[in-house]
């Protein structure tokens, strides 16, 4: 006897059943609408990339999370994509005649062998939007505006878009006198400020071999607070001797001014110089979005990466963009009950019941006409009592059942039943589609 295979998923992976996919599609469609409203075009890249394409772009800590792949008879070392930015860089390097600026979005799964937890999976979708070939801060501000518009369109009213700049972080390291080889550890510690507090950061810095006087200067800096413009003013006072930090502060001031002109609400944007995006390829402004509840991590994250494409071409090309974590966004929307009531459990709008074998051709013809009129329609596929057919429709969330019995057939009518309210009405068969649509819009 053949051994029974357990239907288990790999750790950190999950199935998305139709009801979940319908909710996901609702969210993704809203995201896509906003992306395209700003003129970003769709792009698709393969799930598998050459390993050498991905390695050396993210940093050692991130690269430990990559999934390697190899065909039994193949020689190429391959890997599942870790994000969508490096594949974009490869595409731009391979198609250097693309008109600039090149504005693209991509909605696709990526894979990371992280420890699974709430809102974090090993296979998850990213919704990326990027602009390549535009060096000015207007491109960065537009990316932030896109994030603002997406979350507003989805119904979020309480969220914060955090802004920082890698140049400011570099300046902090310079002014504090931290050696270059200790900067990655410095950044990781600063990034934990909100979670572990000033005392925890100080302990981490001291344990990371950062000199006491440098730790003291860093502690003074980390106590800077206030509104965005106030924070930038204080940073300019503290970091005035760093030309690089001055550039970063100026870039954030320009972005804030542009966001005002774009109509982005000031209370949704905050400069947070302790925010550190983990990927090493960022070179300028960085941004992420968080919500107060549930504490689920960042919903979006990105920044400017002017040197990434140059790793493929030998010539730097300015680029900026962000990624929306669709899993986390949906998790938050479900926990907050934010999904509209009109997002149904099924794509089917009407079930045409089958009275008996003699009336099956009439039921099939009715279903065909409904589909031609734009109504998603099922015909019940088994010979079962009408009560079983209604039970199926109710269980699967189909909003309307249609009856075509001998009396209806002779009269050229059908009977519609609204399964949520139990209301019934008889209508001429040619008006069935309009009647179904009217009821479906109420569901």
Region spans (language model):
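Positively charged, Gly/Ser-enriched RNA/tRNA-binding surfaces
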Residues: 2, 21-40, 49-52, 75, ...
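Acidic, His- and aromatic-enriched active-site or binding-groove loops in soluble protein domains
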Residues: 62-73, 178-199, 291-292
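Polyanion/phosphate-binding surface patch
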Residues: 43-78, 120
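Short, conserved secondary-structure transition motifs
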Residues: 163-176, 191-197
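Phosphate-rich ligand and nucleic-acid binding surfaces
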Residues: 15, 31, 173-181
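Auxiliary tRNA-acceptor-end handling modules of aminoacyl-tRNA synthetases
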Residues: 1-21, 70, 179
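Short low-complexity, flexible loop/linker segments enriched in glycine and/or proline
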Residues: 57-61, 175-177, 394-395, 416-419
